[in-house]
A protein has these predicted regions:
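Residues on the lipid-exposed face of transmembrane beta-strands in outer-membrane beta-barrel proteins
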Residues: 1, 52-58, 103-109, 155-161, ...
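Transmembrane beta-barrel wall of Gram-negative outer-membrane proteins
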Residues: 1-9, 22-76, 99-111, 163-169, ...
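Transmembrane beta-strands of outer-membrane beta-barrel pores
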Residues: 7-11, 72-76, 111, 122-126, ...
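Outer-membrane beta-barrel signature, preferentially recognizing the C-terminal barrel domain
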Residues: 91-110, 234, 248-249, 255, ...
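Outer-membrane beta-barrel transmembrane domain signature of Gram-negative proteins
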Residues: 95-100, 110, 122-124, 130-223
Length: 322
């Protein structure tokens, strides 16, 4: 059993020289005769964070381990103004608040050459962003009142199996149910007479993968990964990857490595619907990535060590989601 609590805070109130601004110096005829960087004071970067973590584990001493983990976060942070903003920081409030609770139940079964694990959990996040401006003394106008609630239920199962020292297999399957409501209470859009405030959506996400690693000799290893995903009701094509690495010279521990992988990514709910900036017509991102590299390491024990490497990578992506 383990219980941890962390609390941190800071007013972040300090003076600094703003090198992103320049103030002109004028003569009596309004000619610029010089410039200087102003000294300013940051008054809008305070934060208060509380983190709680509770862990409970039970080991049967027969290869089974059960666990319960729970996290809680309470955060209240001011967001500082840009250093190029010429407004008065005391006239604005830019604040983000968050409360997140995460819980996980787990079971692991471990044997000499295989392992099985199952997890299930729930995540709740409430997040608020407020942007206010003082339009008159003690009279604040709310420009943005963003509120988001995210509820996620998930389950995961994974396994590992090593029949010999030359082969290693893994498998993983997971399921997530996301329920998201995001809104700006200051903005109401109309769509055919129906009020839409941000978005209120849910989506099921499934993912499964298998991998095999083969080490024919001590200095060479190869692995293949196959993955399949489903978002909502749409399945991705089979996503594959191949990796290879080998030591070409034990002297200097010179190693070559390379990989090729297929990329496929569905847009997130924020990519599709978040206001402003969401695009419900986004297409799925897809492409291929390649990389190769070489590394070395030389040295003398308890005296010195020198290591280095060089890498090359290239990607071809269509419908890239930025």
């Amino acid at each position: 059993v383990s219980t941890r609590a962390v609390y941190s805070s800071s007013p972040n109130d300090y003076k600094y020289t703003n090198h992103d601004k320049k103030i002109n110096i004028y003569d009596e005829e309004k000619n610029i005769i010089g410039q200087y960087h102003p000294k300013e004071r940051n008054r809008s970067g305070s934060f208060k964070d509380l983190h709680l973590l509770q862990e409970v584990y039970y080991n049967t001493l027969k290869g089974d381990r059960f666990g319960l983990n729970a996290w809680y976060i309470n955060s209240n942070r001011e967001l500082p103004m840009l250093t190029t903003d010429y407004g008065d920081a005391t006239d604005f409030e830019n604040r983000q608040r968050e409360q997140t609770f995460r819980s996980v139940l787990s079971w692991d079964h471990i044997k000499s050459n295989w392992k099985l694990g199952v997890k299930g959990g729930y995540i709740h996040t409430w997040m608020a962003y407020d942007y206010k401006r003082e339009v008159a003394p003690d009279n604040w106008a709310s420009m943005t009142r963003s509120r988001s609630k995210v509820n996620t239920f998930y389950g995961q199962a994974e396994g590992e199996y090593s029949p010999t020292k030359r082969w290693f297999f893994t498998a993983n399957v997971s399921a997530h149910q996301h329920l998201v409501r995001s809104e700006d209470k200051n903005i109401i859009l109309q769509d055919g007479g129906k009020a839409i405030v941000g978005y209120d959506k849910g989506r099921v996400e499934l993912s499964g993968s298998v991998s095999a690693k083969w080490q024919p000799i001590d200095r060479l290893g190869m692995s293949v990964v196959l993955r399949e995903e489903m978002y909502g009701s749409e399945w991705a094509p089979l996503i594959s990857a191949f990796f290879i690495d080998g030591i070409i010279s034990p002297k200097g521990n010179v190693m070559l490595k390379a990989s090729v992988s297929r990329n496929y990514r569905f847009p997130t709910l924020n990519d599709l619907y978040f206001l402003p900036g969401g695009n419900p017509n986004l297409r799925n991102e897809h492409g291929f990535s390649y990389d190769a590299g070489v590394s070395f390491e030389v040295g003398k024990e308890n005296a010195y060590k020198l290591s280095g490497g060089a890498n090359w990578f290239d990607s071809y992506i269509d419908d890239w989601i930025i």
